[in-house]
Amino acid sequence: MINKPELNRWRQEKGLEADKLGKLAMMIGDIIHRGINRLIKCGDLERSWIMNAIITHSFQRWDDMCSLETLYKKISRRMDGFKVFWDDKQPLGMIPIASEIMLYHKQIRWAGTCDLVTKIRLRSNSRDLVTMLIDYKTGKEYKEHPLQLASYAMLWNKHIRNQDLRVTHVGNLYLGDLWKKTPKYKLKVYPLDDTLKQKFIKIMDAWVAVNGNLRVKDPEPATTKWEIDKSHLTDIKPRWLGDGEISKLNKQKELQNG
């Protein structure tokens, strides 16, 4: 929805390779998101899980661009960055509230999945915790990123009545693989103010003006009961064959196949 001029220039420079490189970046981001979610919920994550996520992923053309070990390193170094982020913030009272949660509301024209909602201190010497919605980024920084955060935060707050759990700040957590000796991360924080929210709403209005009204469909209800028609079996008495009868049938088949 939000145009990224820098991304468009990159695609022009890379030409035919842009599609594969873009899908590789999406694959890395997907595995990072799933891996962090598992780490938060289970407390640990092993090399074998990442390797399995790579070899079972829907995108398998990565082997045209790098080796399995190189791809593993691209992912593991970003996970190292998240681990440092956690170790920095958790002792200061960080309390995760939700991880990888899909957000939808019938009164709002967009939907999405937020990566993390957490209680966190803005600075190490801050007295109070704030509620922050964080989005993990495994690529370059773009100035449009805070607008995506605002859209998710508005969805979250639409559902939350408890003032203590309503998002007041949003942040992009950038996780790269280019650090040398010490794993690094970058957390860019923005207050969720009216200015940020209105910027996104104006972009949404402009998009709708060009493309027509965007309607988010209500989720299809899950089936709760199954029935099959057995009326044609009313005169048949079902029974299980005993082992002896099965043995006789097998012998008959052997004789027929003779």
PLM region spans:
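Solvent-exposed amphipathic alpha-helical surface segments
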Residues: 39, 43, 89, 156-159, ...
